[in-house]
Amino acid sequence: MVEGDFVDEQSNIALLSSKSMCGDHHSVKNSIGDEIFKLLTKILNSDEKASGDVHTLVSGTPDLSNFNLDNEPLENILAVFIISFIIVVVGVLLLGLIGMIFISLRSGSSNDKKLQSNDEEKQALAEKA
């Protein structure tokens, strides 16, 4: 058995198992695991091409055709940007809320000290009078 045949068998088994898990319900968006699986099988099936691609990427040539961004559905890219934006906005809002609570606690304790000193001054003035 040639090594390529073994890789083909393994990729076919994994593909059949992923199809059986999904059933006949195929959505427009592919999961990240499916994309990683496709990339790994592509690398395993073409050893020479993969090693050449790695060599060109390491040597620093700007060959972006290896990443296949033109085949990526636009919905997936937009979904990633939208989710990232939502995470950033929620994080900033939470940090702002925590900051406001911290500032209000600090100012509240300093206001109590000011009120207490004002009361003591009033009592001292009242006792003198």
UniProtKB/Swiss-Prot annotation:
It is a single-pass membrane protein. Residues 109-129 are annotated as: Disordered. Induction: By the genotoxic agents methyl methanesulfonate (MMS), bleomycin and cisplatin. Residues 111-129 have a biased composition (Basic and acidic residues). Keywords: Membrane, Transmembrane, Transmembrane helix, Vacuole. One of its GO terms (cellular component) is nucleus. The chain crosses the membrane at residues 77-97. Its main location: membrane. Coiled coil: none annotated. It is found in: Vacuole membrane. Present with 922 molecules/cell in log phase SD medium. This is Uncharacterized vacuolar protein YLR297W. It comes from Saccharomyces cerevisiae (strain ATCC 204508 / S288c).
